């Protein structure tokens, strides 16, 4: 596990965590529980992404955007397809995806710059659900993961299949724009065009988003598993739901870290 040893953990003088996982698995819940004590600093990568993106030409998206209301990020990304159904052209969709990627890289790396400057003792970096799409878990020199691991203990949230099915069901009821790795997105788009035999401007935006979501979930499960294996550790969604304080979370992490290091 890159950068983490039991002795290093036991001799630490701080609790600094980068929490990773798919949207809906409890990153924000955990951050909220830790902030209640007023002794934990919270850094939201999604909020920082918005601050980077919503300038100049995109300044209209700043209206109503806050750390407690991140919905404008999804609105900015949009969905490709029929304009009469709220869709945007695929070229514009790709442009926005690329802007999001650039902003996410900057916002994620900024968390490490902040901790180096402030040296907060209790700090949680609440990463974006798409962080797994901008890193290579198998590369020991991956810039983002290496930087995070040098400043935080990387904790990935995992869940059982029933929980993932619940995420899929909720998404089906209310599909929202997502960020995809570009080659994966283009592959999905081409397969969908062949499947439906439709022109791009006739595609139902929600139908395409739903088409790709289940494949995206399976992809991200594997990516987050590789991140936890190579760069940190994993904790279960059901255990996260029981967290009521920072000390609860620290105890859970210590247990999981010990379990991993003795294997």
Describe each PLM feature range.
Residues 126, 146-197:
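Conserved phosphate-donor/acceptor-positioning beta-strand/loop module used by diverse small-molecule
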Residues 30, 34:
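Hydrophobic positions on the alpha1 helix immediately C-terminal to the Walker A/P-loop
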Residues 26:
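Conserved glycine(s) of the Walker
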Residues 23:
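The conserved Walker
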Residues 39-54:
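Short beta-strand-centered segment that lines the nucleotide-binding/catalytic pocket of NTP-utilizing
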Residues 59-139:
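ATP-dependent small-molecule kinase phosphotransfer cores
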Residues 19:
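Hydrophobic anchor at the beta1->P-loop junction of P-loop NTPases
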Residues 197-263:
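NTP-dependent small-molecule kinase module
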